[in-house]
Amino acid sequence: MATKRSSSHSKGSWLFLAKELPKLDWRVVNRKTEKPFKIVLLGSPDEQEQLMTMLFSFPHYSAQFFKDLLPQLPSFDRTHSEPYLIHLSDLTELADVINQTKDSLFILTMNSNLLVHTSQIPVFNWQEMPEAKTIHKMLDQFSGHAFALSFVFPLFRRSMIEREIKQTAMQNTTWVVSTSLPNLIPGPHQIFTAPFEAASDFVVLTINEFKLMMALTGLLGQKVQPLKLWMQASVVLAMAKTAQVSATQIISKVPAGGGLIVKGAVSYAFTRAMGEAIVLTWITGRVQSLSFFKNRLQAFMAEGKAIAGRLIKPR
C-alpha cells in the first residue's frame, strides 16, 4: 500500500510540475543580460591590453575538484565585447565620453597616475586591492548590471555564479523550513520520513532549480532559448528525482525534532549540488553523472544543517 501511495504521489508531483514549468518567464534573464553599459579602459595600449586579458580570464569556479575537471579552460571570442568598451589613453577625452554616453558607465584602470575622482561614474583601480575584492566591489557598485557584466566578460562569472547558487539555496531552505514549522508538533514516538515527501516541496524546489538553470545560462554568456536547454533540463529533472531518493538514503528516518533541520539541509545541499552540475554541464558540454551529484549533495549537508538550524532557532 505504501508503495502504491508513493507511486501515486510521485506521479502527481510530476504532473503538477509539468503544469507549472511553462509559466516560467525565461525572457527575464535575457533582459538582465541585455542591459546596456560601457567600460572605459583607461591607460596606455599595453595597460589596456592587460585589462582586456583580465576581463576575459575565467577564474576556476570553486574547489580543487573543479580544477581537476577543467584542466583546460575554454577560450573566449573578444569581438562581441567591443560595443561595451571605450579605449582612452589619457584623461583629455573623458569629459566628452561622460557627456556623450547615455549608457551606464564606469572606468577601469591600472595606472594610479590616471586616477580620476568623479561623482558621476564609478572608478576602479585594478591594482588598488586583491582581484577578488575588486570584482566584488565592481559587482556591488554596479549591481543593476551584474548579469550583463557576467554575460559579456568571463571575469565576473565565478562570483556571479556563486552568488546566484547560494542565494537560491538560501531561498529554498528558508521556504522549506518556514512552510514546515506549523506542522512541527510531533508526539514523542513520532518519526519524520526524509525530505521531499510533500508534493509542494518537490515541485517548488524543482521549479526554483529551473529558474536557477536559466540564470546560470545567462551568467555563462548564453542567451536563454528554451528549445536549446534540453541538456540542462535533463540534468535538473534527473537529479531532482535522484534527490528524492538520495534524501531517503542519506537520512533514512530521523527522530522527532530533528527532521526539520535535515529537511532544510537537503534542500540547501540539493540546490548547491544542482548548481554545480549545471555549470559543469555548460562548460564541459557533458552531462554530469548522478554519482557526481550524490557526492556533492553529501558534501553540502553539514553546511545545510548549520544554516537550517540557524533559521529554526534564530539568535
Where are the regions a protein language model picked out?
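Membrane-inserting effector segments that mediate pore formation, membrane fusion
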Residues: K166-A273
